[in-house]
Amino acid sequence: TGGRLVHMAAADKINRLAQELVGRWGYSRIGPVAAPGAGESLRTLRSKYPQLFFLLDSYDYNNVSAKKCAAAFDKYGHGAAVLAGTKISQAWLAAQTDGYDYAEQAALAVERIQRNLTGSVTIL
């Protein structure tokens, strides 16, 4: 309403619903799915809603980086999860293999993604 952005209005609603669903680790059992393409929006959401758990979709997109995803995590490296299913399941296509070693290529893709994320997110 008014000058509010849609994702902020949605996060306000989720936050109201989540207040009584906070688990022992300090995060709610419900949270928003967020696109990490706009790192500054994630930074704003994280600072305003420290108890929401964020699910970051679209890590596979070209304009998304581990650095942008880092904005959704708290100072301990907690509070968010990154989805990269397409990047992982189609890793063998990028490697230009015959597809028989798909499990190995998927594992290598996971390792690359993990290295990228841990380079931008400090996990304590």
Regions found by a protein language model. Give the residues of each.
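Conserved anion-binding
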Residues: 1-33
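Conserved active-site and cofactor/substrate-binding residues in soluble primary-metabolism enzymes
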Residues: 5, 9, 40, 61-64, ...
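Surface-exposed amphipathic alpha-helices with a cationic face
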Residues: 15-25, 44-49, 114, 118
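Extended, compositionally biased low-complexity polar/Lys-Gly-rich tracts
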Residues: 30-35, 110, 114
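A C-terminal functional module that forms or caps the active site or interfaces directly
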Residues: 32, 36-83, 87-91
